[in-house]
Amino acid sequence: MLDVQSIIIYLGLAIILFFLAKYAELRKSSGAVWLIVILLSLISGLRADSVGIDTETYNTIFDLISKGVTKGIYGIEESFIYICRVLLGIWDNNQFLFLIFALISNGLIIFTIWDNRDNISFRWSVLSYYITFFTFSLNGMRQFLAVSIIVYATLFLKKGKYVKFIIFVLIASLFHRSAIIGVCYLLFEIIFVKYFESKRKLIIYLLVGIVVFFGIVATYGLVNYYSKYFEQQLSSMGIMMIVKAIMLIWSFGVIETPKNNQERYFCFSNRWYYFAGILLNSLNYIFVYMGRIGLYFYIFESIYIGNIFKAKNKTIWTLMFKFCYVCLLLYYLYNNITRGGQGELPYRFFWQI
């Protein structure tokens, strides 16, 4: 049975966000961008225990941290526990933590999209993010925080500020140790090295050598830590990632390649990040939860789709290609508000329980 409140909230928010993003795009209004972040964060941060697969678990964890009983907390980074303890010292309220974490994750991602507004359709990127990824802020909260920090760090990566990028990757790992995979973004720089000046090329070669060396050690540790997830196998395969991979390849034929070097770098880098995300996310069809590791790259689908809708409608194929993505987003939205999948239905605010 359909839940009316959930439909009003999720569908209504999709419409509001699209037109707010359109207003921000046309008026270059950072205030409208902040309003988008606040609306997303309120829905995520004010949710009840019943919304999201692990919200109740996090409530229990926050209660234990508040009481100083941290020995009974397993599988959570000590650094995350310390961060929660500091925040609870400001206001001993679990909902305060949910709201702060929602503001951080949604804020970093939305403002990363906003920073790329010259190369994308901001409204379509925001809508894509909301429909496809917003529910992750209701589940796997620590990892989604880490993902948002990595996504924001790519702004430094594209400017060649590699030290800042690495610092942000380390900060992200304080929330979720899997964030260390973010250093793999440096490996992609080898592919785009032709777009860089000589000094940046040299830095990249040195950094990649270091990343490969330490990455082997780190990967061994991570594989051991997450080996239990490889043991939980699925017997069925899906086709959505295959469809998305085909559409990504199709985009090279129907979307005009920019002539400006900087724009080409933006276009190709985002496509490669997204492609890596598709490949890694496909693990979810074989191993339960392992697809989440691909979220660090897969989330670039939002910027990729924004870039698609920014392209000029020079041929009927371009229009058809965009129409396919409209249908895809509508399909996801329909599933979100009628079936869920991340425990987001029925939506209730914390004061309603």
Enumerate the predicted regions with their spans.
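Membrane-embedded helix bundles of polyisoprenyl
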Residues: 122-140, 144-149
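Transmembrane-embedded, aromatic-rich helix segments that form part
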Residues: 165-167, 178-189
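Membrane-interface transmembrane helices that cradle and orient dolichyl/undecaprenyl
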Residues: 150-163
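Transmembrane-helix signature of polytopic, membrane-embedded enzymes
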Residues: 27-28, 110-131
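Membrane-embedded alpha-helical segments of multi-pass membrane proteins
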Residues: 5-16, 35, 100-104, 141-149, ...
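Alpha-helical transmembrane segments and terminal signal-anchor/GPI-anchor hydrophobic tails
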Residues: 49-51, 55-60, 64-65, 81, ...
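Short hydrophobic/aromatic helix or loop-helix immediately within or flanking a transmembrane segment
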Residues: 56-64, 70-92
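Start-transfer (signal-anchor) and selected internal transmembrane alpha helices
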Residues: 1-40
